[in-house]
Amino acid sequence: GEDPFDYSYIWEKMYRRTHAWGRRGLGMVAISAIDIALWDIMGKITNKPVFKLLGGRTKEKIPVYASKLYSQPIKDLQKEAESYVKQGFKMFKMRFGWGPKDGPEGMKKNIELAEAVREVIGYDTDLMMECYMGWNLDYTKRMIPKLVKFNPRWLEEPVIADDIHGYAELNNMNAIPISGGEHE
């Protein structure tokens, strides 16, 4: 029974009511789903796309990156990277498949993945590296010096989202920009 154009009021009302069970996880997912639905309703009522409701275009072009370079046999990974290069991508995100439980051999495999991708895309492109919270602080601190030579634009979510001190310590190493917060 609320007016969808009162979206800020509705959002704050929902957010305040999550205090008892925490402001993370499913509660925030539910708020996000309702928020998206409100914007969609407002767009339908006004017959405008949501980006116009949010203030309109701010740039002529938006940079995008190829984001599916998963751990796989090296030849397949390189073939996939080549297809992205042919499509004109200049930014790429790869994902590591090995972590602390895989020991030195896993580290070696991660380095081989980075080498294989860089071999195809070259160094005049951006390479982002995704860990999907699969590493711990110690493993990440040992991997970073091995990854610096690949000139990554960032290392994404090396440790779990709640490890604020770990993120701070990695950031203070100042070797590779650290990205996180997607799974907060």
Walk through the language-model features, giving the residues of each.
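Metal- or metallocofactor-binding catalytic centers and their adjacent structured scaffolds
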Residues: 1-45
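Active-site nucleophile and cofactor-binding loops and adjacent substrate-binding regions
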Residues: 29-31, 181-184
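Glycine-rich, aromatic-flanked loop segments that form ligand/cofactor-binding clefts
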Residues: 26, 35-71
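Metal-dependent enolase-superfamily TIM-barrel catalytic cores that perform enediolate-based chemistry
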Residues: 61-173
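Residue-level recognition of hydrophobic positions within alpha-helical transmembrane segments
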Residues: 31, 36, 152-153, 178
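Ligand/cofactor pocket segment of small-molecule handling proteins
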Residues: 173-178, 182-183
